[in-house]
Amino acid sequence: MFNPVKCFYRVRARPQISPNDQTKSRQITKCQHPRLGKASFFRDPYAKLPNRIPPTVESKNGQLLNQNLIEILDIQIKNQYICGKFSVRKMKEYKKRVADQILSDKLESSGAVLIEGPKYCGKTTLASQQAGSILSMADPERLSQNLALARTNISRLLAGKTPRLIDEWQIAPQFWDAVRNEVDKRDEDGQFMLTGSAVPPKPKKDEYGNIIEEEKIYHTGTGRISRLKLRPMSLWESEDSTGDVSLGHLFENADTVDGESHIDLDRLAFLTCRGGWPKAVLRKKEKASLAQAFDYFDSVVSTDIKRVDDVERDEELARRIMRSYARNQGSQATVGTILADIKNNGDEQMSDATVYSYIKALKEIFVIEDSTAWNPNLRSKTAIRTSDTRYFIDPSIATAALGLGPKDLINDMETFGLIFETLAVRDLRVYADALDGKVYHYRDKNNLECDAVVHLRNGSYGLVEIKIGGTDLINAGADTLTTLAEKIDSTKMKRPSFLMVLTGIGDYPYRRTEDGVLVVPIGSLRD
């Protein structure tokens, strides 16, 4: 017999409802429980559940009650029968990421995984797909309570079904050592996931310069905490690439390529300005999709660049530095070069050290991701340039910094080509991660340059020239690749697995008969 009580408990669905299901609800029965009161439930429409549901697992604060039943918030129940109003609501669409499998593999081999990357790139959403329970440190309703627990009884915050996701963990840096110690105690893999948009903050100090113990990170986490860098979506992840050409397959057999691409110049310009931000990808209207990059840029210069290390920085100067960085995408511009560019576009006096501090802060919040130099064994003693190549982590940051839209890029093909290179490098990095690889850049004293070298852990590598399209540019890229390949001393290292000109536009991929160079439109590439 159920006795009515005046109380209401929030219940939410597990994220397994088909995105095609429309919001609807149906009344099963009206009754109340003496402890639970009135209850509303969201359930999978395909699950066959009785009117009375016997949850078999104790639940609190969002942990699961049963494998395919419900989640319940702010209440603790065990072996109670619940009934009430069942509803089905449309869940947010989740586009699969290349990093899904990478994260799964890391959870099987490490006690904890740190997921890093820029704000808005989908770190929390990625981790939530594999999380057993979630702690959101940025939740304003619980922030004060969570911070207090982090200082006094952090083990309570670590308790929960594994893998336990701790979102925005850097708000309380004590989590780093606590997770490391807990992993040691449990001696099991796949216990925790940590997500955040910045590197761990520097320890806070008191008025005498002493590190405050609560904020101090003592250990690196080596051997216990694995790292995963998540970038904005590649074209394959956003479903803008057909995926007919697999980068991984090219390392096994590059004799033939086949497929097609549906990206023309107008579409490429839009994709470059939109970027790979998940919210922008999911938005149906182009204007709304393009706004995401500008919102991100404004947030970086007005707030994020200051919060990363609690240093007050000038918003306008941050804008000018990022604009200069955008103009130097794909180059080895020094800090001095960027400084000179800023001075040419303004009157303010500043030093190399000032520019460097801003660039360093932008790297710490994953806005900038430069490409390091590749140093192969060559037949001749050619001096290799070791300067990093300048890139933002996503091309839309460059277009937002310069205030450009798709039409502006088409009207300035030189700038378009430079920023497209950033898009191509972003995608290559995403795909290389799935292959245990990294992307480098090559340039020697004779200015022989290769835009991207995809180098795998096993020593295999591929040489890539990035061109927006056109016969002349493709021919020039192929000549560069064959020249560099001939310089490599194959007695000391492997021959390249493939030579590829990665283009922005083109209807289909093909292999050139005269030199074996692959020509692959980016709209056909995948991991």
Where are these regions (language model features)?
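N-terminal pre-Walker A segment at the start of P-loop NTPase domains
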Residues: 71-104
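Short glycine-rich substrate-engagement loop in P-loop NTPases that contacts/grips substrate
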Residues: 135-160
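Conserved lysine of the Walker
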Residues: 123
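Interdomain motor-coupling "hinge/lid" segment immediately C-terminal to the ATP-binding subdomain
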Residues: 202-331
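Conserved catalytic/switch belt of AAA+ P-loop NTPases
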Residues: 177-200
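Accessory nucleic acid-recognition modules appended to NTPase machines
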Residues: 285-460
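Domain-level recognition of nuclease-like catalytic cores that cleave nucleotide substrates
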Residues: 52, 504-527
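Hydrophobic positions on the alpha1 helix immediately C-terminal to the Walker A/P-loop
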Residues: 126
